[in-house]
Regions:
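C-terminal lid/capping helical subdomain adjacent to the catalytic/cofactor pocket in oxidative enzymes
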Residues: 114-164
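Active-site substrate-recognition segment that forms the wall
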Residues: 1-119
Length: 164
């Protein structure tokens, strides 16, 4: 994750990664949202979950920290209130907003593979906002690498030793 460069440094490796902070607001009451949506103009994801609705968005590059910026949270709420009729984000839900850190590389591609310096180390990090989506494919590639099989795709663009 976002701490990968700190771990890599202990092994003499340099990974160009930084933490990209995303925010989420979980709405505990009923909402008019029935289907997941991405509000493209504001880049806010709206996801009905079991028992609540999640609003999520932003990509804040501010280092490894969990400081919640109220203006970011309110912007996410405003986006949903603008798109959905009779939609209001209750103040208590706003104050319970959380954030998470996503590992982001300069070119937006994850690092997948073995660095030249360590033949017994396989890296799979830097997936940014696509970690869960890319997890199964990355897992398959890591299994192929670990078992010594040829990988099912060319990993050159994802190589851990690439430089920017």
């Amino acid at each position: 994750g976002s701490w990968s460069p700190l771990l890599a440094k202990k092994l003499g490796l340099r990974l160009s990664l930084q933490a990209g902070k995303g925010y989420r607001i979980d709405l505990k009451g009923q909402t008019p949202v029935r289907l997941p949506a991405v509000l493209m103009e504001t880049k806010v994801a709206v996801t009905p979950m079991e028992g609540f609705t999640r609003l999520a968005g932003t990509m804040e590059l501010s280092g490894i920290n969990h400081h919640i910026r109220e203006n970011r949270v309110r912007a996410i709420a405003r986006a949903a209130e603008t798109y959905y009729e009779d939609f209001q984000v209750p103040e208590p839900d706003l104050t319970q907003a959380k954030c998470g850190l996503r590992p982001v590389s300069p070119d937006g591609l994850p690092y997948i593979g073995r660095p030249a310096k360590w033949e017994n180390l396989t890296l799979a990090t830097g997936h940014a906002m696509m970690g869960w989506s890319m997890g199964p494919a990355t897992g398959k590639l890591v299994a192929e690498i670990a078992s010594g099989k040829p990988t099912s795709m060319d990993l050159t663009p994802f190589h851990p030793d690439r430089r920017f």
